[in-house]
Amino acid sequence: MESTAPCICKDSNCTKIGPPGYSGILGDKSVEFLRDPAVFVEKYCEHHNSRVFLTRLFMKQTLVIADHKLLTKFLSHSHEHFYNGLQDFSDLFGHNIMFARAEEAANLKRILLPLFGANAVESYQTVLRDVLDDWSRNLDLNNSVNLYEEFKNISLAYNIHIFMGVKKADDEEFFRSIKELSSAHWHGVTSVPWNFSIPFFGNGGYKKAMGAKKKLLKIIVERLSSANSSFFEEFRRKNDGEISQELLYNHMLLFSCALIPKGVGSVLAMFFEMGNKWKHLLSSDGKLSEDDLDCVLLEVIRMFPPFMGGTKVASEDTSVGDYHVPAGTAVYYSFMAAMRDHSAFLYPEEFMPGRWKKVEERKKNLGFGTGLHGCIGRHLTWNCIKEIINYTMDMFTIQFPDKCPPEVKILPVLRPKEPHGFTMIKKYG
């Protein structure tokens, strides 16, 4: 049903229609949104009979996009007229490619992409194998295993080795310290971005996160000056003086923090939680072919993207699809909703890995984002995820949960609400 709402540009002479919905000051729906973003988006898509609608979130007029075609176009063409809606949290990570405007982001991407390319990823294989060998040797199989936590730790150990040049097996205390600080830093993402405490309420999560950030940066600077991080040396060499020292270290913070491990842990946990849905694809020796593994992973990410979506804010009067969008308007886009859009996916609520058999269809998966601010480390992350799966299935017999999918928590990263305790038996020795 086509919207009959007036255009939100407020120009009395404008003949365009506006998106369905209401964004009045008294209609803020932040509490309802935070309760369950996925349910919120689908509820109002159904209410307005539209995959694009207007609402008010966090005291800001917000256009919500759950339409796959429009979202793909928006992510590919919005960088000139929008800035990252998490700009208020930029102090938490320092200025980096996530918050950079178009020209700077393009330059940073040019420098960074080769560091995460196929050749670079290949050189990190030995590092990941060492981390996995150390993990399997020390894994307690007498009790059920929380794979979400295990895979987060594996990813963090891998990142610390690559980006800081420190082996977890050689310095367990250092790993524990980074893990603790990364956790405190990460929790700032779900806190109000105020760097102060409120009387009687103690220290705010954001203040603690900022403290953790300072400690992490100090450790990163100290370690990179003494440890052998080939990644950092290559990063410093390739930028040819175009990037300041502060910006270099801000990116090393981004790569070393909990963001990547939580995303990796999310995908891997949901992959194994959904085991009963794809175990029929296993060969007689308990393996997935590379193509089947790709298809299953793409379907896991389609249904359960680790990061549900994002927000951009219009820096000037512009348009999104058929709608005018005034400066200051937020655009919230939902990867989860867009990848369950009936106009883009047949039976979107069904787990169907076969939908990804055609390689040309795979570009429809938005789990890593797309456009200028799409994930620069997608090749490294994809390779890491597949290697961990293959290693785990080679080394262990795993009993999958009878019931799937599990209930999930979505914010700040998707993961099982009650992670299944996996029974794992070593195949060798």
Predicted regions located by residue number:
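N-terminal membrane-proximal hinge/A-helix region immediately C-terminal to the signal-anchor transmembrane segment
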Residues: E2-F93, D134, K364
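Cytochrome P450
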Residues: E2-N13, K43, R56-L63, N84, G94-D130, L139-H161, D170-R176, ...
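Conserved cytochrome P450 K-helix E-x-x-R motif and the immediately C-terminal K′/meander segment
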Residues: D28-N49, G286-Y323, T329, H342
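Conserved cytochrome P450 K-helix/beta-meander segment immediately N-terminal to the heme-binding cysteine loop
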Residues: E80, Y333-V359
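Central I-helix of cytochrome P450 enzymes
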Residues: N159, L216, I220, R237-K287, ...
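Cytochrome P450 catalytic core segment centered on helix I
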Residues: R176-I243
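Cytochrome P450 heme-binding "Cys pocket" and the immediately downstream C-terminal segment
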Residues: H379-L414
